């Protein structure tokens, strides 16, 4: 690897360590020419699928857009940054596991709603009300009733998932 200080291509690895999860390798390096030390990180670079929007346009997956939209729904809610990041990681892992080059934006939206429903019901309702573009108050009220009828201890009201929403995402 080329030295970032003197551009010499001859460097030596002096120390190598993996992070706790085993998905990042940290290497300490020393330049043979100028003797300066620097750190590099290696991680798998997985290609996220392109997103196909409702109008047919395609765009690259944007991690910051996903975090931003979820953060907006979670604004002023008691959810930690770590919990948000874990939810985003699960969404990205699910998208990668599909093995597709392209994914419909509707699928991403449904995955976001599924994660927000687990994190915070108010954030879920906020996101769903914008995402589903409710035509009237009755549709909004129905969503609120659906959330309110579920038990508060984390167990679903209907332990046997049914319907197209659950079939689409395998859960």
Curated annotation (Swiss-Prot):
It comes from the Bacteria. Binds 1 zinc ion. InterPro entries: ATP-cone_dom, NrdR-like_N, RNR_NrdR-like. PROSITE patterns: ATP_CONE. Pfam families: ATP-cone, Zn_ribbon_NrdR. GO terms for biological process: negative regulation of DNA-templated transcription. Its cofactor is Zn(2+). Residues 1-21, 147-171 are annotated as: Disordered. Keywords: ATP-binding, DNA-binding, Metal-binding, Nucleotide-binding, Repressor, Transcription, Transcription regulation, Zinc, Zinc-finger. Residues 49-139 form the ATP-cone domain. A zinc finger (unnamed) spans 3-34. GO terms for molecular function: ATP binding; DNA binding; zinc ion binding. Belongs to the NrdR family. HAMAP family: NrdR. Negatively regulates transcription of bacterial ribonucleotide reductase nrd genes and operons by binding to NrdR-boxes. This is Transcriptional repressor NrdR. It comes from Azoarcus sp. (strain BH72). The gene is nrdR.
């Amino acid at each position: 690897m080329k030295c970032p200080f003197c551009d010499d291509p001859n460097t030596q690895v002096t120390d190598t360590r993996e992070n706790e999860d085993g998905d990042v390798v940290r290497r300490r390096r020393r330049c043979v020419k100028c003797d300066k030390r620097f750190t590099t990180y290696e991680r798998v670079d997985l290609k996220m699928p392109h997103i196909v929007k409702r109008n047919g346009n395609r765009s690259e997956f944007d991690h910051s857009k996903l975090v931003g939209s979820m953060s907006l729904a979670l604004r002023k809610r008691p959810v930690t940054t770590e919990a948000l990041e874990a939810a985003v990681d699960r969404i990205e892992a699910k998208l990668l596991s599909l093995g597709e080059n392209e994914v419909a934006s509707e699928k991403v939206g449904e995955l976001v709603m599924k994660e927000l429903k687990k994190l915070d019901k108010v954030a879920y309702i906020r996101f769903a009300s914008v995402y589903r573009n409710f035509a009237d108050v009755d549709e909004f009220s129905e969503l609120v009733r659906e959330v309110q009828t579920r038990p508060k201890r984390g167990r679903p009201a209907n332990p046997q998932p049914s319907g197209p929403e659950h079939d689409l995402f395998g859960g």
